[in-house]
């Protein structure tokens, strides 16, 4: 569930227990105190809005198990900085530097970075609205929760992007000390990769560019990912369809759905109830 705060910014609770109680609190700080001893993450949400009007207040950030990560992207937009792609377009205003991720890093805070959809219409994971990536040894509930707690997370805006980043064998989110630096990086996306930046203290340490055109060694088997788009229709009208996709002289090894949820987040005028429509 979610709590709004003009003073501290909006926050979202993610509970381990499915029957966790709804906590009554007077402020976000009171909420954090009452959450101690419980398996719950309290995460700052759409952080880049104006301070004092639902934007994040970094003075209330508490490093630790309650808030191991913060939300950099959702369907509200991108809070990495007050510039760049995916601006905030909601009626709560444009982005403000003092609530952004880069501002929090400049203060010396340690936190993981994630994204989430904020899909009010019952479509968690809606394509293009933000998603979290977790590096865990297995897909069990305990393994995923521990990976979240230890900040082994990353953020993606739409496609699933696998990021395996290590510094002297430490994973994303770990804290290490050393006199030398050895970086390992492996990135796999659902489309061609334009570039990868390694950023340190607000400065680009290295940039790796992908090829402008696909590269396939002569005589090698062609391996590729193909994105299929279909539609379109008026956003308020639903269309029931069934489709089939096949390939000649080849094999389809996997399919990654890119289904989007409803194009709105609030009840529509004149509607007293909303029915979730399922893509599969």
Predicted feature residues:
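Extended, charged catalytic domains and RNA/DNA-binding interfaces, predominantly
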Residues: 1-280
């Amino acid at each position: 569930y979610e709590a709004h705060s003009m003073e501290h910014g909006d926050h979202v609770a993610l509970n381990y227990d499915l029957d966790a109680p709804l906590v009554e609190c007077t402020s976000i700080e009171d909420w954090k105190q009452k959450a101690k001893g419980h398996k719950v993450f309290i995460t700052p949400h759409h952080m880049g809005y104006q301070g004092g009007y639902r934007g994040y207040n970094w003075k209330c950030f508490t490093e630790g198990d309650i808030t191991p990560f913060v939300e950099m992207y959702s369907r509200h937009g991108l809070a990495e900085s007050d510039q760049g792609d995916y601006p905030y377009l909601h009626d709560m205003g444009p982005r403000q530097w003092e609530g952004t991720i880069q501002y929090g890093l400049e203060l010396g805070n340690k936190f993981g970075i994630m994204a989430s959809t904020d899909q009010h219409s019952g479509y968690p994971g809606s394509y293009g609205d933000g998603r979290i990536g977790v590096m865990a040894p297995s897909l069990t509930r305990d393994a995923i929760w521990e990976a979240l707690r230890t900040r082994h997370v990353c953020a993606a805006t739409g496609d699933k992007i696998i990021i395996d980043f290590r510094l002297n064998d430490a994973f994303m989110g770990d804290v290490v000390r050393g006199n030398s630096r050895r970086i390992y990086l492996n990135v796999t996306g659902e489309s061609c990769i334009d570039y990868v930046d390694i950023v340190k203290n607000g400065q680009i340490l290295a940039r790796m560019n992908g090829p402008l055109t696909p590269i396939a060694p002569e005589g090698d088997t062609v391996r590729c990912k193909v994105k299929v788009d279909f539609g379109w229709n008026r956003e308020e009208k639903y269309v029931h369809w069934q489709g089939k996709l096949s390939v000649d002289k080849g094999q389809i090894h996997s399919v990654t759905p890119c289904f989007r949820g409803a194009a709105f987040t609030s009840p529509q005028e004149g509607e007293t109830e909303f029915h979730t429509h399922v893509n599969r």
